[in-house]
From Swiss-Prot:
Lineage of producing organism: Bacteria, Pseudomonadati, Pseudomonadota, Gammaproteobacteria, Enterobacterales
Pfam families in UniProt: HisG, HisG_C
Keyword Transferase found: yes
PROSITE patterns membership: ATP_P_PHORIBOSYLTR
Annotated catalysed reactions: 1-(5-phospho-beta-D-ribosyl)-ATP + diphosphate = 5-phospho-alpha-D-ribose 1-diphosphate + ATP
Source organism, top-level taxon: Bacteria
Protein name as catalogued: ATP phosphoribosyltransferase
Gene field: hisG
């Protein structure tokens, strides 16, 4: 039986969010040993339990107060919310923040040989999907009537099997659609992974731990988006060079030993440093230009 005094976090056991969720928790300093078939794991260095479940179970675990935090795709969360609302429930939860992985889109797709002149083409059509409520919400706003065909997997084969005229499914690259003779025609929902918390009061211990995790998650995400830049530059071109660099803060400028005409510049960049920028820096006299990844960051 779970110790209710420990913080409980639900994450996807397997699937497109599983590895990134585990990586995020580990980068936040949570020491866990997740075996392939293990559904429950205990952090070695924090009072945290990790529950590994199906992604579509996570919203219910949060809304019913079984776990404290969950990492879930916004598409799954919104579908679960609409499902419960359609049943007369009023589920509650708190979205703490969007995360920097799990990008996808929920899109309409048609067979390659079918014409597309906008959503009105779907009037009266049969549409296969795993997201019936998101689909209904979108088409209801446009005043389009349709017939829903609920499938929990292999949605893309529905038109070829004669089950549906079109599909509404998650798309990342579009390769699966193309392999099944389909083309993406309309994006109805864009999604990323997010961190959610159950509603209601938590103990001071749990809330303090969540606050600590939020600071660490912010640091991990900011570090992923930032680079540490080091270079040598002529002192007379210093202002021009600094203006080229997209910095999070003002750079550190130090004199080079034995060379009064050149300086060393160190800075954290919160934007990508492209090859063109590096070439422009070199044209201004910069040398020994290094762009390094940042593992952790706290402001």
């Amino acid at each position: 039986m779970l110790d209710k005094s420990r913080l409980r976090i639900a994450m996807q056991k397997s699937g497109r969010l599983s590895k990134e969720s585990q990586k995020l928790l580990e980068q936040c300093g949570i020491k866990i040993n997740l075996q392939q078939q293990q559904l429950l794991a205990f952090a070695e260095n924090m009072t945290i339990d990790i529950m590994r479940v199906r992604d579509d179970d996570i919203p219910g675990l949060i809304m019913d107060g079984v776990v404290d935090l969950g990492i879930i795709g916004e598409n799954v969360l919104e579908e679960a919310l609409l499902t419960r609302q359609s049943q007369g429930d009023n589920p509650c939860y708190v979205t703490l923040r969007r995360l920097d992985f799990g990008d996808c889109r929920l899109s309409m797709a048609l067979p390659m040989d079918k014409p597309w002149n906008g959503p009105k083409c779907l009037q009266g059509k049969r549409i296969a999907t795993s997201y019936p409520h998101l689909l209904k919400q979108y088409l209801d706003k446009l005043g389009i009537n349709f017939k829903s065909c609920l499938l929990n997997g292999s949605v893309e084969v529905a038109p070829r099997a004669g089950l549906a005229d079109a599909i509404c499914d998650l798309v990342s690259t579009g390769a699966t659609l193309e392999a099944n003779g389909l083309r993406e025609v309309e994006v109805i929902y864009r999604s990323k992974a997010c961190l959610i918390q159950r509603s209601g009061n938590l103990s001071k211990t749990k809330q303090s731990l969540i606050d600590k995790l939020m600071i660490r998650i912010q640091g991990v995400i900011q570090a992923r988006e930032s680079k540490y830049i080091m270079l040598h530059a002529p002192a007379e071109r210093l202002e021009e060079i600094i203006n080229l660099l997209p910095g999070a803060e003002s750079p550190t400028v130090l004199p080079l030993a034995g060379n009064q005409h050149r300086v060393a510049i160190y800075m954290v960049s919160n934007e990508a440093l492209f090859w063109e920028t590096m070439e422009n820096l070199k044209n201004l006299g910069a040398s020994s230009i290094l762009v390094l990844p940042i593992e952790k960051m706290m402001e």
